[in-house]
Amino acid sequence: MPKQIEIFTDGSCLGNPGAGGIGAVLRYKQHEKTLSKGYFQTTNNRMELRAVIEALNTLKEPCLITLYSDSQYMKNGITKWIFNWKKNNWKASSGKPVKNQDLWIALDESIQRHKINWQWVKGHAGHRENEICDELAKKGAENPTLEDMGYIEE
């Protein structure tokens, strides 16, 4: 029986574009692990995606996951839009290349071995774990140490 994991994620960006950070809380039974990383130049949407990717990549085996995020962009992208993007060679309905394609591909790869129940939570609404993730993401953005490879200035 696969492990049942809860994951909470958030991304933050100071300036958008600007320095950004990710925050995540992973919970298995009574155990919790937190992630916080900061990137020099990025966007809020890239940080929302990267938070989920980083959290999923810490798991060592296939799991049953309930994943909570306050990002409609991430949730809609991975549960609705990605199917047509892949069919259309990573082009949006406008015919233009999908933004953040590198991270969508990475996210698509990182979900394949898991069964995920995607949940949207309202941000800044007193949801304990979302608030923790928000703080972790802000902390990362305030102390960036990493390059967001794939970020393209517009």
From Swiss-Prot:
A GO cellular component entry from the record: cytoplasm
One GO term (biological process): DNA replication, removal of RNA primer
Pfam families documented for this protein: RNase_H
Ranges where the RNase H type-1 domain occurs: 1-142
Subcellular location: Cytoplasm
Catalytic activity: Endonucleolytic cleavage to 5'-phosphomonoester
InterPro entries with a match to the protein in the record: RNase_H, RNaseH-like_sf, RNaseH_domain, RNaseH_sf, RNaseHI
Cofactor: how bound: Binds 1 Mg(2+) ion per subunit. May bind a second metal ion at a regulatory site, or after substrate binding.
Binding site for Mg(2+) 2: D10, D134
GO molecular function: magnesium ion binding; nucleic acid binding; RNA-DNA hybrid ribonuclease activity
PANTHER family, per the entry: RIBONUCLEASE H1
Subunit-structure text: Monomer.
UniProt protein name: Ribonuclease HI
